[in-house]
């Protein structure tokens, strides 16, 4: 496959499916803990370590400060993720040497986990819902905005603008693409559920072993 890099200052995305999940980086093992993808974050979500919500307590936390320090530290590591699946086209794309290149529309998946970016990328969907429009009917133009840190360093956040003047007519091909994205999500969720079941079984086996070790051997003597 061609592994060359293509660059663009802005892109148009067409979102077919939006889902939500929790994610946390496990620095000890160098892996990510991820939950199921769901329509929202209102319920508890199984994760691939056999827990819920990447370790975050179930339900609403009434008093965060009352939690143990290790739990507070864990919760701060957990990110809300807005998962966008759809098509992307790069605008005025160039290669590493700055030469203009033509790039076909490509499928994409974007896990938006930065807190500010999570909010920014939610605004187009709120606007479309108010106008009773489907996300797949419009292109969202995404750019970037520089933000300064107190140290003088910079970081960038996405910007998002919806083109409401042009509406995309849905085709049979779009229906198939939508089905493909849903199938991908279902396969991902199946993997998470299987991992959850496996880890839960391991935990139960370990607990059973500890219980057996705690048993007291009782010998019943026979008649003399």
Regions found by a protein language model. Give the residues of each.
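Short His-Asn-centered micro-motif
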Residues: 86-87, 111-113, 140-143
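Alpha-helical protein-protein interaction elements
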Residues: 8, 12-17, 102, 110-113, ...
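Short linear motifs at secondary-structure transitions and domain/linker junctions
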Residues: 51-63, 114-119, 133-138
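OB-fold ssDNA-binding interfaces and closely related basic DNA-contact patches used
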Residues: 1-102, 149-155, 163-169, 212-224
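Long, compositionally biased interface segments
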Residues: 123-224
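Short helix-loop boundary/capping segments
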Residues: 91-131
